[in-house]
Amino acid sequence: MLKPEMIEKLNEQMNLELYSSLLYQQMSAWCSYHTFEGAAAFLRRHAQEEMTHMQRLFDYLTDTGNLPRINTVESPFAEYSSLDELFQETYKHEQLITQKINELAHAAMTNQDYPTFNFLQWYVSEQHEEEKLFKSIIDKLSLAGKSGEGLYFIDKELSTLDTQN
């Protein structure tokens, strides 16, 4: 049985994953608007992936006999000055998610909630991959610079980049 503190924290994380999905969907819209179709497709796939992260938490809460609580989610930021700025923000967001997952895993361990700690290990591993993925995109954008040709090739690569890297 989950302690009330863990139920609250799992619900918070579930809602943060929902926000992540909406954020990446909004970023996808920005990319589409600015004709970065490869980046838009990549971010749409990533938005779907974040929704599966939310669903895993939702299912864990119900599987443990608890009620998931979906809260009102704030509108994600929608304006960026460049593709580089947008991906800098994705990286910062993934760092925030990593911090929150680590805090959640720590709370599970502190509360001797070993089943939840075990469940969260998938997220710990996933966040390592997420940060690595977005850091690699930022590095490529930095190498490409602001030239149209460089951005074109990065955008083209993003269209084929698997979110499960």
Curated annotation (Swiss-Prot):
Gene3D superfamilies named among the record's database cross-references: 1.20.1260.10
Catalytic activity: 4 Fe(2+) + O2 + 6 H2O = 4 iron(III) oxide-hydroxide + 12 H(+)
Domain Ferritin-like diiron: 1-145
Entry keyword Metal-binding: yes
Residues that hold Fe cation 1 according to the record: 17, 50, 53
Matching Pfam families: Ferritin
Family: Belongs to the ferritin family. Prokaryotic subfamily.
Subcellular location per the Swiss-Prot or TrEMBL entry: Cytoplasm
Annotated binding of Fe cation 3, by residue: 49, 126, 130
Ligand binding (Fe cation 2): 50, 94, 127, 130
Record carries keyword Magnesium: no
Annotated GO MF terms: ferric iron binding; ferrous iron binding; ferroxidase activity; identical protein binding; iron ion sequestering activity
Effect on the protein upon substituting residue 130 to A: Initially reduces Fe(2+)/O(2) stoichiometry from ~3 to ~2
One BP annotation, GO: iron ion transport
Superkingdom classification of source: Bacteria
Keywords: Cytoplasm, Iron, Iron storage, Metal-binding, Oxidoreductase
EC numbers for this chain: 1.16.3.2
Protein task: Iron-storage protein.
SUPFAM superfamilies: Ferritin-like
Subunit structure, interactors included: Homooligomer of 24 subunits that assemble into a spherical protein shell (12 +/- 1 nM diameter) that can sequester at least 2000 iron atoms.
Protein name as annotated: Bacterial non-heme ferritin
Main localisation: cytoplasm
Cellular component GO terms held in the UniProt record: cytoplasm; cytosol
